Amino acid sequence: MRIFALVLLIVFGWLQHTLWLGKNGISDYYGVNNEIQVQQQVNEKLHLRNAEMFAEIDDLRQGLDAIEERARHELGMVKEGETFFRIIGEESH
């Protein structure tokens, strides 16, 4: 009976070691779970960026206001008949 109890104790110890420290054990589970959470955060940021880009694309397709705004700010263009004024602040000496 003692030998049987000893064998059971050894098997139980081996199973516990495998569960906690072995391949696909608890430690691997927590590591993969952390990686999943990090990747979900990255995916959420990319999803928001994509949504902004799609909104900008839709705006460019549907309206001339966005195109006009980009031409004014990025290219420095003005409409025909408009006068461009640049206001420069005073420099402190």
Curated annotation (Swiss-Prot):
**Designated gene of the protein:** ftsB
Query: Which regions face the Periplasmic side of the membrane?
Result: 22-93
- Which residue intervals are topologically Cytoplasmic? 1-3
Q: Tell me which InterPro entries the record gives.
A: Cell_div_FtsB (IPR023081), FtsL/DivIC (IPR007060)
Q: Which Pfam families match?
A: DivIC
For this UniProt entry, which segments traverse the membrane?
A: 4-21
One GO cellular-component annotation of the UniProt record comes to: cell septum
Q: How does it assemble?
A: Part of a complex composed of FtsB, FtsL and FtsQ.
Tell me what this protein is called. Cell division protein FtsB
Source organism per entry reads Vibrio atlanticus (strain LGP32) (Vibrio splendidus (strain Mel32))
Which PANTHER family does this entry report, sorted A to Z?
CELL DIVISION PROTEIN FTSB
State what this protein does.
Answer: Essential cell division protein. May link together the upstream cell division proteins, which are predominantly cytoplasmic, with the downstream cell division proteins, which are predominantly periplasmic.
Tell me its family: Belongs to the FtsB family.
Q: What is its main location?
A: membrane
Record's bilayer topology term: Single-pass type II membrane protein
Query: Biological process GO terms, please?
Result: FtsZ-dependent cytokinesis
Keyword annotations for this protein, in alphabetical order, are:
Cell cycle, Cell division, Cell inner membrane, Cell membrane, Coiled coil, Membrane, Transmembrane, Transmembrane helix
Domain of life according to the entry? Bacteria
Chain segments annotated as coiled-coil in the UniProt record? 33-75
- Compartmental location: Cell inner membrane
